[in-house]
Design a protein with these regions (language model features):
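All-alpha prenyltransferase/terpene-synthase fold signal
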Residues: 1-365
Length: 365
């Protein structure tokens, strides 16, 4: 007889195809709803293309997995269950579009960011970049509304649906606060940025909506009580931070790759745990060099090479790798000592392993 974890693994292997089909149909079926005329039509096409771009779909898959782990019995093909999962993917796209405007990024999933798509449609007119950014912000807001409406329109029991919406909106507020932290910490010298502030930013900006939201919402829709939802959220926090450190390390290895001057958090002046660890473990003269390179914000090969040398010299990569593994172990210990059933614990391990496998080379986007 197959174990619950084995059955979950098999079901999750089938889930991406089910979700991708539902995602494509969702935008096809909503074409008339968003038929706002000639000016908006190409934006809806771009919106559809952006959301349906090939991605890992970590958030919807975690929601589906959590729903099953905690006893939900609807099939993964159930329309309302898929709508709940889709709400997280729409939320993710809303966040990415706004994030790309803030960072002035040009590529997302190896294709143009949304504001660059709009800019390209406008052609060579004065202010195309500004208009592209403005339109992208508004389209992001529309996706936010779509996300809320998609979750609201599920046929779960009203009490469950209302509770899910309440959690969902709280996660959005947390993400916004994390974005503010990211922006404001980016204006500070690395010497004035505390590790605790970076960890808080990671938790608010990404961990809550990427890991806690799907797992808690899936469990909630399966009927899990508030005490166990709080326990689940506490359990997820070190896992989420570990995955964010993994993202830092992946990006650093990409930073050291062939395209050394492409946009990265390091060159954009973002304050990461990797940079803070490097600063903490350098001697004073090297700290000054690191501060100088980070303050220039110029993507020239000399500054890039110096940052790389200083990070390597500090041993920060090894330190962060150790911290990441320690956080994963902390979560495992907490899971083993939790009040969840053996089957639920095994299911959560399977979910964490799935995410780790899918993100070990390219992160969580």
């Amino acid at each position: 007889m197959n174990s619950p974890a084995t059955l979950l693994r098999a079901e999750l292997q089938h889930a991406p195809a089910v979700f991708e089909d539902f995602l494509a149909r969702f935008f096809q079926e909503n074409t008339e709803r968003y038929a706002y005329g000639e000016l908006f039509e190409p934006l809806y096409l771009d919106m559809t293309e952006f959301v349906t771009r090939r991605g890992k779909r970590i958030r919807p898959l975690l929601l589906l997995g959590s729903y099953r782990i905690f006893g939900g019995d609807r099939p993964f093909e159930d329309s309302s269950l898929l709508r709940a999962a889709l709400s997280l993917e729409l939320l993710h796209s809303f966040i990415l579009i706004h994030d790309d405007v803030i960072d002035q990024s040009e590529r997302r999933r190896r294709l143009p960011t949304f504001h660059k798509l709009v800019e390209e449609r406008l052609g060579k007119i004065d202010g195309a970049a500004r208009v592209g950014g403005n339109v992208a912000v508004v389209v992001g807001d529309i996706l936010f509304a779509m996300a809320v409406d998609t979750l609201r329109s599920t046929d779960f029991a009203p009490a469950l649906r209302d509770a899910a919406l309440s959690h969902f909106l709280r996660y959005i507020s947390d993400t916004g606060a994390g974005e503010v932290y990211d922006i404001l910490l980016g204006t500070r010298d690395i010497a004035r940025v505390e590790e605790a502030d970076i960890s808080r930013m990671y938790t608010l900006k990404t961990t809550r909506y990427t890991f806690e939201a799907p797992l808690v919402l899936g469990a909630l829709l399966a009927g899990v009580d508030d005490d166990h939802l709080r326990e689940l959220a506490e359990l997820i926090e070190p896992v989420g931070l570990a995955f964010q450190i993994q993202n830092d390390l992946i990006e650093y290895h990409q930073f050291k790759g062939v395209d050394r001057l492409r946009q990265t958090d390091i060159l954009e002046g973002k304050k990461t745990l990797l940079l803070r660890a490097a600063y903490d473990h350098l001697v004073d003269v090297d700290r000054s060099f690191l501060q100088l390179c980070l303050s220039t914000r110029t993507s020239n090969d000399a500054s890039v090479s110096k940052i790389e040398q200083l990070i390597d010299k500090s041993g920060a990569v090894g330190l962060l790798t150790g911290k990441m593994e320690s956080l994963f172990q902390k979560a495992e210990t907490a899971l083993e000592n939790s009040s969840f059933t053996p089957a639920q614990r095994e299911g959560l391990r399977e979910a964490f392993a799935l995410v780790r496998q899918q993100t070990q080379h390219t992160g969580t986007q």
